[in-house]
Amino acid sequence: MALRIGTGIGSDTNAYFAGKNAAVKALSSLGVDVPELGIAFSHYEYPILQINDGIKATLGEKNLVIINSQGNIISNTFKKRSVVLSLLSGHSYYHAVSLVKNLSENPYVAGHHLAWGLLDSLEAKTEKKEIQKKLVLVFGSDSFIQKTELLRGLQEVLGVRFPIAGGIVSSDSSLNPAELSFNRQSSKDGAVGILFAGDNLVIGIGSGHGWIPLGLPKKIKKAERNRIQDLDDMSPLKYYMQYLGKHIDLRNEDITSIATIYPLGLEVEKDSYIVRFPKFFEPGGSIIVDSQVVENQHARLMMGTRKALLEASEKTISKALEPLQKENITPKFVILIAGIERKEILGIDINTEINIIKRKVPETTKVIGIYTRGQFAPLEGHSQLTSPSYYQNGAIFIAAVGIKNA
């Protein structure tokens, strides 16, 4: 039986019924097939175990992953307070799921445990037969600063260039952890991974962000954990004031909008930048971001515009579809993971971004997505299936999933 997917959405006020209604619609969408895996993106305001119970009241005891979100996508629609459930079935692919808790104690070790949990689970399903592993999706609670350490632990086991993507989930602000669960085991200090494998499974991925360099690059001279203290010969505050003007007191104002439009870009390869949104400026001029920063890395002011973000989205979906188009394969589904900060810039154009993606795929292709405050994704504009992933802010990641034609 080929890979099939059914999707459904629930947006009831009551969490139990939101989950239940999403499950009823997803089962109807799936048809006669029996689901083997459920993946639910559930807004952080819903109690996750109530969502679990509502879904399982309809599905029974199937493998179910639930991830808190800032907002969800189904088809061509952005919906904030909702549950979007995807049900997968078929024997033409394999999946493995693993959950780790106490993530903040040692994210690097947690990454190792998560990766080995996925590999052990897959080995048990395939009876140790060698199967091509294609993609890992990983979601972690925003309970820790060392986001890159979680990724490093995963990469040391799975391979630095193995496709790893996902997000960090928080509630109303970054470093305010939201919840995730696997089969009613839930955590606000954990990570869940989903491994997709199969010799006939074809997955294309793309990623980008759309913020463009504005200011001159400066070297990070002094940094401690997630605090940037010195950029060459000046504080981060002075660097910002140099471009935005001295009339804005960034230490006393709510800088959310300013930080979203004008984030910092960290250079990880020549002329390739990942985005970091400032959380706030300290009285001494230091800047706080949501993940650890290394010294001697170049940083520069970036700028986001609607046009540039939408162009990045179009490039991202085109890149994701390339491997499938080369083999004349219709994607069964497309999954999108994106920074909720994109909505701050795009506003009502957030649906334009979604429609750019929807228009690129056939009507039969399901489109689902989750908005988070941090993303794991390859660099913009690189060979996506062989490029290492990085922890980023504001990114858009897309995976297109299909099955080889018989």
Feature annotation, model-predicted:
Residues 1-58, 62-347, 351-360, 365, ...:
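Small-residue-enriched flexible segments
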